[in-house]
Structure formats: C-alpha cells, structure tokens
C-alpha cells in the first residue's frame, strides 16, 4: 500500500497561515490512513474543508476534524460513525505526529490531532498514523492561538485540503 501525502491550507480568522503536507502511514495503518485521506479529498461526499481546529493546547496538540458540528462534539468516518483502533504500534514521538482523537477504545471517527510535542502518555491509547512532512512550523504557530483550557483565541480553519 502506498503512503499517501495530503495537504491542509490553514487560515487564521480567514488570513492564510500556509500549507502543511502530511504523510500517512498506510503501509502499517491502512484503514485509518484511508479514512483521513478520503476525508481530505472529499470523495465520499463529506470532508475536512471548512472545518476548524476547535481545541488547541500549547505544548500539547491541535485538534480538529469535526466537520459535522464545529464544536468538537461531531464525528463521522467514511466507515460510518465510529471504527475500531487499527493498531497502536506507532508512538507519539514529537511535534508533527498525526493521531486519531477518540473517546476511548475503538471510537475513531473524523477527529484527529497533531502533536506539538512528545506525548508518550498517549501511546497505546490513540492511533498515530501520520506525520507532518512539510511546514510543521505552521502547526507550531497555531499553538499560540490556544489556551491551557483548550479554547482558541482565533478561528483556525482548514480552508482547503486534498491529496498530492
């Protein structure tokens, strides 16, 4: 299986921050990677485009992927509402690691987070399935618009997304 690369065009209050590219580990985590890739392209009729990062915690992560309700309570995968943890072999080794947000075991949907630091306490609990390949500095810059309580001071949006 080919490791796809997707992109996000990120904006802050409608102003461009830049484009990040994300390599998906489809060779090891194919089902999770395919869900994210398809939600990036919109080929199933729904997508990440226009959704926001609703939870940003400096020194920890930036969470997004709720395109059904922009407040973090919505979740929808290409497989239905939720799907099982595929495997938990990848570690949360540092800034730029892409992982599934969940509400416990086997509750993956569309929500994801990008790590801003090493988060080893998430190993074995969240499926890490990709890594920011280019422009991780944009992810790091978005941290400045978050607070410890996970609220955001600016609207950070995925203005466009797709696959290279």
Curated annotation (Swiss-Prot):
Residues forming coiled coils: none
Job of this protein: PPIases accelerate the folding of proteins. It catalyzes the cis-trans isomerization of proline imidic peptide bonds in oligopeptides.
Principal location: cytoplasm
Top enzyme class: isomerase
Catalytic reactions of this protein: [protein]-peptidylproline (omega=180) = [protein]-peptidylproline (omega=0)
Subcellular location: Cytoplasm
Family (UniProt): Belongs to the cyclophilin-type PPIase family. PPIase A subfamily.
Transmembrane segments: none
Domain of life: Eukaryota
Descriptive protein name: Peptidyl-prolyl cis-trans isomerase A-like 4D
Further comment: It is one of six related genes or pseudogenes found in a cluster, thought to result from gene duplication, on chromosome 1.
Organism field: Homo sapiens
The EC number(s) this enzyme carries: 5.2.1.8
Keywords attached to this entry: Cytoplasm, Isomerase, Rotamase
GO molecular function: cyclosporin A binding; peptidyl-prolyl cis-trans isomerase activity
Example GO BP: protein folding
One Gene Ontology cellular component: cytoplasm
Residue intervals of the PPIase cyclophilin-type domain: 7-163
InterPro entries per the UniProt record, alphabetical: Cyclophilin-like_dom_sf, Cyclophilin-type_PPIase, Cyclophilin-type_PPIase_CS, Cyclophilin-type_PPIase_dom
Phylogenetic placement of the source organism: Eukaryota, Metazoa, Chordata, Craniata, Vertebrata
């Amino acid at each position: 299986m080919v490791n796809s690369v997707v992109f996000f065009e990120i904006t802050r209050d409608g102003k461009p921050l830049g484009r990040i590219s994300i390599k998906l580990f489809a060779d090891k985590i194919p089902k999770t990677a395919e869900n994210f890739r398809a939600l990036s392209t919109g080929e199933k009729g729904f997508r990440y485009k226009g959704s926001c990062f609703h939870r940003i915690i400096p020194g920890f992560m930036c969470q997004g992927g709720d395109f059904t309700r922009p407040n973090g309570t919505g979740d929808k995968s290409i497989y239905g509402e939720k799907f099982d943890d595929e495997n938990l072999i990848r570690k949360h080794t540092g800034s730029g690691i892409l992982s599934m947000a969940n509400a416990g075991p086997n509750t993956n949907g569309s929500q994801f987070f990008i790590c801003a630091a090493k988060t080893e306490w998430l190993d074995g609990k969240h499926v890490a399935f990709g890594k920011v390949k280019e422009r991780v500095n944009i992810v790091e810059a978005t941290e400045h618009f978050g607070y410890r309580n996970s609220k955001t001071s600016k609207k950070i949006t995925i203005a466009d997304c797709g696959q290279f």
